[in-house]
């Protein structure tokens, strides 16, 4: 049995079904990351020194070394959010070539973010700063690792919508445009999470 898809707005919410669904999903994501941020705040406020004493000097030095990478990644994700919006606008204007260009740029930005993150992780692990090293590194890898998984998930979805999924445009353009809007909301949320992670984990230590 196939579930019918409606592009019309619901009378009770003013949203179409897919958009209502993504907002409910993002609400659960807010609770997930909110719990992790709350745990971080409790750990930090309860510690006499942060990062934890012992290798404190080394950790702070390592953090300073990786701030440029994190700053670059922040700019990359902001650009990706802008191009995501422009891809959706291009579809509203029925310009498929511009849509592919802008969404392709979003994907490139996402891949750049992941590559930079890979080198950042490799550097930390090479220096011996693994999750088991101390409390700070444990929550650092937990929060940024979870964020990376969300980025990877977004890459798969956007890659599909840029590639084979684009066939829907020929038969159901409005439905396809809605899909891009829903995917964009997810992508903006992932970017917003990083906007909070960046200062909390890199700048305020």
Labelled PLM ranges:
Residues 1-205:
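...captures the hydrophobic TM-helix bundle architecture rather than a specific catalytic motif
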């Amino acid at each position: 049995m196939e579930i019918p898809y409606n592009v019309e707005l619901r009378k009770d919410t003013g949203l179409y079904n897919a958009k209502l669904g993504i907002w409910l999903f993002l609400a659960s994501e807010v609770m997930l990351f909110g719990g992790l941020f709350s745990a971080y705040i409790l750990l930090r406020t309860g510690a006499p020194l942060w990062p934890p004493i012992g290798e404190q000097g080394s950790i702070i030095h390592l953090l300073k070394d990786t701030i440029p990478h994190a700053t670059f990644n922040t700019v990359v994700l902001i650009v990706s959010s802008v191009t995501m919006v422009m891809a959706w606008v291009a579809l509203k204007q029925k310009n498929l070539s511009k849509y592919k260009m802008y969404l392709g740029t979003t994907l490139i930005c996402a891949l750049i973010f992941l590559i930079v993150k890979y080198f950042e992780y490799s550097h930390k692990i090479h220096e011996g700063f693994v999750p088991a090293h101390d409390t700070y590194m444990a929550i650092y890898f937990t929060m940024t690792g979870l964020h990376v998984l969300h980025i990877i998930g977004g890459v798969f979805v956007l890659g599909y919508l840029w590639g084979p999924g684009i066939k829907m445009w020929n038969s159901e353009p409005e439905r396809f445009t809605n899909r891009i809007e829903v995917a964009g909301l997810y992508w903006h949320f992932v970017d917003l999470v990083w906007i909070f992670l960046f200062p909390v984990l890199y700048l305020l230590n």
